[in-house]
UniProtKB/Swiss-Prot annotation:
This is Hemoglobin subunit alpha-1. GO terms for biological process: hydrogen peroxide catabolic process. Keywords: Acetylation, Heme, Iron, Metal-binding, Oxygen transport, Transport. The modification N-acetylserine is found at residue 2. PROSITE patterns: GLOBIN. InterPro entries: Globin, Globin-like_sf, Globin/Proto, Hemoglobin_a-typ, Hemoglobin_oxygen_transport, Hemoglobin_pi. Red blood cells. Hb 1 is a heterotetramer of two alpha-1 and two beta-1 chains. Involved in oxygen transport from gills to the various peripheral tissues.
Length: 143
């Protein structure tokens, strides 16, 4: 599922609109991830509190959204642009790549909640395809 030039433009435009609330979306998406998929908490066992909405979860959610925004700037070469992040997640953090898809789903839910008018079916499709490509790029070094 490749991204068309229209998809890329839609993603860039939506993420531009979303920038004012990106920290909230990242924090809420990671909070939802650990609530809905509690097995993901195992990656954060070194945190004192990995419960939904806790300070470490919010902080890391914000960090993740920063990475997603970085990926938007590398939308024409996600695999090449995110190679170091792929290596980090594969070799050091050892995150199961299925979790990238789970987090992407949580992000879509949060985006639609925060921007119900702007999150049209066309935006939904484009952002979903982008997050799927992002997940593939992060999983590149697992092969």
């Amino acid at each position: 599922m490749s991204l068309s030039s229209k998809d890329k433009a839609t993603v860039k435009e939506f993420f531009g609109k979303m920038s004012t609330r990106s920290d909230d979306i990242g924090a809420e998406a990671l909070s939802r991830l650990v609530a809905v998929y509690p097995q993901t908490k195992s990656y954060f066992s070194h945190w004192k509190d990995a419960s939904p909405g806790s300070a470490p979860v919010r902080k890391h959610g914000i960090t993740i959204m920063g990475g997603v925004y970085d990926a938007v700037t590398k939308i024409d070469d996600l695999k090449g642009g995110l190679l170091s992040l792929s290596e980090l997640h594969a070799f050091m953090l050892r995150v199961d790549p299925v979790n990238f898809k789970l987090l992407a789903h949580c992000m879509l839910v949060c985006m639609s909640m925060v921007f119900p008018e702007e999150f049209t079916p066309q935006v939904h499709v484009a952002v979903d395809k982008f997050l799927a490509q992002l997940a593939l790029a992060l999983a590149e070094k697992y092969r």
